[in-house]
């Protein structure tokens, strides 16, 4: 089967990019590809059979119909206007046309210098490409909207970061790479007609049902806000910290995008800061909902030329509603509640307080809770707490709450185990795969990808265990 590519972005938004070709790496080689995703997209297996070089995966060749561009956008970084940014090391190769008429961006990260590289070198390193591939696939299998990873190419090209590393490329796929920062770029250049063109493009291709509706722009922004609210709720319930929620890292489609200094909670710490460059804690775990709202407010400002203020404010309210509604639903599912009762939030907050005092493992606590039996006054979870008197008091209230549901243990446990993962991508697991890959051993990278495809399956190995102490202290930064 021949892959078909289109160039809608290039054809319809000429002011938003620079056309250019990728710059290949030295001695590039394909070290991993996503066989399951490739099969779903009907990508011929022969494309991955590269023995001399890295082919399209390393930017050495293009497929018919590809028209590479680097996109320009701007943004607020750590709450401060940063001006023009753009694809400093990534190139949108083309948009794959799928059978249902939708498209999928093929974006090559680490593809070399672009006009938007600023002081950078246009490269990604093996460490960061491995982390992003693992994180995006982990999030997908957790059911959280995200970009996807299709392939990783390693090389012998030296790249200087905190230390000297080697260059790599990641083929990232997404329904769209449209960001809040695209709109900010033209708003602050005082080109509101181009801001409106971006909105028209989004509506035409992603919300076509609103094209002929008079209030289409207001409806569109409401949906952007709602999707963002649901995304942040998913992050908070699974314990995911993005680490660098700049406006240029926010997706119009409500996708998790730009994995850098991310982390999943190990010990439950609501003030967890994943990014060691975030000295003020702006992007700490418990601040993500308010930062997302702040970012939406920045986006709303760019839309004032063609959306009424009242409509923008209604959309921002929609964010809060979507966030709280989705978060509440997810947390009730994690606790095994099928109905909503007035004391549920208090019960959850009591558990969080107990976990924070004890440094309980976030993922393992909820997974162990999912094995609770109503009639049993004891729980294996009890042994993980030092203050067992406090746990016993909470657990008795929890069991009493379970008894108000007309649901048997088997059904409740089944529901809980579908939303409480046994495995998340802990930083130490990613680092173990990276360390091996940097020595030329890709086995752990492939094995970890397989494990992350089944996050809701109980395991008795170290993929589902608490991290070693050194694993809790790993520092990650924007170069990650």
UniProtKB/Swiss-Prot annotation:
Residues annotated as binding ATP: 86, 88-89, 109, 121-122, 172, 179, 258
Where, in this chain's numbering, is Mg(2+) bound? 249, 258
Q: Which reaction does it catalyse?
A: L-seryl-[protein] + ATP = 3-O-(5'-adenylyl)-L-seryl-[protein] + diphosphate; L-threonyl-[protein] + ATP = 3-O-(5'-adenylyl)-L-threonyl-[protein] + diphosphate; L-tyrosyl-[protein] + ATP = O-(5'-adenylyl)-L-tyrosyl-[protein] + diphosphate; L-histidyl-[protein] + UTP = N(tele)-(5'-uridylyl)-L-histidyl-[protein] + diphosphate
Q: What is its EC number?
A: 2.7.7.-, 2.7.7.108
Give the superkingdom in one word. Answer: Bacteria
Q: Indicate the enzyme's highest-level EC class.
A: transferase
Swiss-Prot/TrEMBL keywords: ATP-binding, Magnesium, Manganese, Metal-binding, Nucleotide-binding, Nucleotidyltransferase, Transferase
Cofactors, names only: Mg(2+); Mn(2+)
Instruction: Give the positions the UniProt entry annotates as the active site.
Output: 248 (proton acceptor)
**Mind telling me which Pfam families this protein's record contains?**
SelO (PF02696)
Under the GO molecular function aspect, what terms does this record hold? AMPylase activity; ATP binding; magnesium ion binding
Annotated function = Nucleotidyltransferase involved in the post-translational modification of proteins. It can catalyze the addition of adenosine monophosphate (AMP) or uridine monophosphate (UMP) to a protein, resulting in modifications known as AMPylation and UMPylation.
Q: Which family does it belong to?
A: Belongs to the SELO family.
**Name recorded for this polypeptide:** Protein nucleotidyltransferase YdiU
The protein's organism comes out as: Salmonella schwarzengrund (strain CVM19633)
Lineage of source species: Bacteria, Pseudomonadati, Pseudomonadota, Gammaproteobacteria, Enterobacterales
């Amino acid at each position: 089967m021949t892959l078909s590519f289109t160039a809608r972005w290039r054809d319809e938004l000429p002011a938003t990019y620079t056309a250019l070709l990728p710059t290949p790496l030295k001695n590039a080689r394909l070290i991993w590809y996503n066989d399951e995703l490739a099969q779903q997209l009907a990508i011929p297996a022969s494309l991955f059979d590269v023995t001399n070089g890295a082919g399209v995966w390393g930017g050495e060749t293009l497929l018919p119909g590809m028209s590479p561009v680097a996109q320009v956008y701007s943004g607020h970084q750590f709450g401060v206007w940063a001006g023009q940014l753009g694809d400093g090391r990534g190139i949108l190769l083309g948009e794959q046309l799928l059978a249902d008429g939708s498209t999928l961006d093929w974006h090559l990260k680490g593809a070399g210098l672009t006009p938007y590289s600023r002081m950078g070198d246009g490269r990604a390193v093996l460490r960061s490409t491995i982390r992003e591939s693992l994180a995006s696939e982990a999030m997908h299998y957790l059911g959280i909207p995200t970009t996807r990873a299709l392939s990783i190419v390693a090389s012998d090209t030296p790249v200087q970061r905190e230390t000297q590393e080697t260059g790599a490329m990641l083929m990232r796929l997404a329904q769209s790479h449209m960001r809040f920062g695209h709109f900010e770029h033209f708003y602050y250049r005082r080109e509101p007609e181009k801001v409106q063109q971006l909105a028209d493009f989004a509506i035409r291709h992603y919300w076509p049902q609103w094209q002929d509706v008079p209030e289409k722009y207001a409806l569109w922004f409401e949906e952007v806000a709602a999707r963002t609210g649901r995304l942040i709720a998913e992050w908070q319930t699974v314990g995911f910290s993005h680490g660098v929620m700049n406006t240029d890292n926010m997706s119009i489609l409500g996708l998790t995008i730009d994995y850098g200094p991310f982390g999943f909670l190990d010990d439950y710490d609501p003030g967890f800061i994943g990014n060691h460059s975030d000295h003020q804690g702006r992007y700490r775990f418990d601040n993500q909902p308010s930062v997302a709202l702040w970012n939406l407010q920045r986006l709303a400002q760019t839309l004032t030329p063609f959306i009424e203020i009242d409509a923008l404010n209604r959309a921002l309210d929609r964010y809060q509603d979507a966030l709280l509604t989705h978060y509440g639903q997810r947390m009730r599912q994690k606790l095994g509640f099928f109905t909503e009762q007035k004391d549920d939030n208090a019960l959850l907050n009591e558990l969080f307080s107990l976990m924070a005092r004890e440094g309980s493992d976030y993922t393992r606590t909820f997974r162990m809770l999912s094995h609770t039996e109503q009639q049993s006054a004891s729980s294996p979870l009890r042994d993980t707490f030092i203050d067992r008197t406090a746990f016993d008091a909470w657990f008795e209230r929890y069991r009493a709450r379970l008894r108000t549901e007309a649901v048997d243990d088997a059904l409740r446990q089944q529901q809980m185990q579908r939303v409480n993962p046994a495995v998340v991508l802990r930083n130490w697991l990613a680092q173990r795969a990276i360390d091996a890959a940097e020595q030329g051993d890709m086995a752990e990278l492939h094995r970890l990808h397989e494990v992350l495809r089944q996050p809701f399956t109980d395991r008795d190995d170290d993929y589902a265990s608490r991290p070693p102490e050194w694993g809790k202290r790993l520092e990650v930064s924007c170069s990650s």
